[in-house]
UniProtKB/Swiss-Prot annotation:
The protein's name: Protein FAM209A
Keywords, ordered alphabetically: Coiled coil, Differentiation, Membrane, Nucleus, Signal, Spermatogenesis, Transmembrane, Transmembrane helix
Major location (coarse): nucleus
Gene from which this protein is expressed: FAM209A
Compartments, record wording: Nucleus inner membrane
Membrane topology recorded in Swiss-Prot or TrEMBL: Single-pass type I membrane protein
Length: 171
């Protein structure tokens, strides 16, 4: 996750530095300062300041937009590193597994880990059921259904995605 944040900050820095460096190279307007073409003659604008700059044109504001998120990300990364490293006096013995230490670090990671474990268990149960059905079809035990030679599975333990989804193979 921190690599994603760092890459976003890097892209933001590159974009802002590009805008900062090349903003002075933009073409200046060809009309004189304070004059606007109005028909065939020029109309003079009143009270036009020398340098009109909006908040988007402020280089310091863009620099602030880049530096503040970068500092925040660095502080978060340092705090995460400090959480992972515990002092030697507080470390447990060899009884605690390193997996359990990592799981206690973040509740989001813990939830994702538990979800993945449940999905893995469900997938193993499903594949086991498919293998049992395939083996039963191959041996013909317990069923009156007789399969043709072309429908007989070559390996009752090998399960393909096409067989799970019920699609016929093109070969």
């Amino acid at each position: 996750m921190w690599t994603l944040k760092s890459s976003l900050v890097l892209l933001l820095c590159l974009t802002c530095s590009y805008a900062f460096m090349f903003s002075s190279l933009r073409q200046k307007t060809s009309e004189p300062q304070g004059k606007v073409q109005y028909g065939e003659h020029f109309r003079i604008r009143q009270n036009l300041p020398e340098h009109t700059q909006g908040w988007l044109g402020s280089k310091w504001l863009w620099l602030l937009f880049v530096v503040v998120p970068f500092v925040i990300l660095q502080c978060q990364r340092d705090s995460e590193k400090n959480k992972e490293q515990s002092p030697p006096g507080l470390r447990g013995g060899q009884l605690h597994s390193p997996l359990k230490k990592k799981r206690n670090a973040s509740p989001n990671k813990d939830c994702a880990f538990n979800t993945l474990m449940e999905l893995e268990v469900e997938l193993m149960k499903f594949v086991s059921k498919v293998r049992n059905l395939k083996r039963a079809m191959a041996t013909g035990s317990g069923s009156n259904l007789r399969l043709r030679k072309s429908e007989m599975p070559a390996d009752p333990y090998h399960v393909t995605i096409c067989e799970i989804w019920g699609e016929e193979s093109s070969s």
